[in-house]
Amino acid sequence: MRVLALDSTGPYCTAALCDTSKVLAYKTEKIDRGHAERLAPMVAEILAASRLTPKDIDKLAVCTGPGSFTGTRVALAFAKGFALPRKLPVIGLSSHAILTAHFDPEARKKIVTISDVRRGELSWSAIFNGSILQTPLTQPKDVARKRIEALGPDNIIEDGIVDGRILAWLAADLDPAEYPANPLYSRGPDAKLPGGLDP
């Protein structure tokens, strides 16, 4: 199964194309801003490098966050726009799920994943023995650190970088009904409509 995996939730713009356990092409660039302008050309580049066309893709996978409102939407919108006319399934996984995927769920480890989402805030989540203790939560740094310390984690993953290849491998066997591509924003949009309403 050929899976195209995308991530635009953080400072990196990433696209990976894998076939079962084989990496066909992979690109990741630290760009901070401009994901919307870079992602489509990046996908075209990895398709060309693999000598494949869009019709050769079987499934899409996208990192759903936590990330900024704008950045998170870039890969999500691209994935859904790519998949819809081709009737392809789209799998959504959080960056925290991707970063903890290599831990053995039978090891009974308490693992905390932390992302610095700027503005003095951290987004963090926790798992224990493969089960969710805390879904991604954004809090002021001092509050988050106290909560994490009280939890007493065995391992902490901080500001990890999503590997698109791992995202593709994980997504290959997942059901889109159980892992929908829904955004996980670290905070709401900065832009406001007249009257202070969110867009």
Residue ranges with predicted function:
Residues 35-50, 96:
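Short, well-ordered amphipathic alpha-helical segments that serve as non-catalytic structural scaffolds
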Residues 43-59, 151:
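Phosphate/pyrophosphate-binding loops at sites that engage ATP/ADP/AMP, CoA/4′-phosphopantetheine
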Residues 1-23, 30, 34-37, 91-199:
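Oxyanion-binding and handling regions
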Residues 44-45, 80, 84, 170:
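Short glycine/serine- and small hydrophobic-enriched flexible loop segments
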Residues 26-31, 64-68:
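A short glycine/serine-rich beta->alpha loop
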Residues 59-90, 95:
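DPxDG-like acidic metal-binding loop motif
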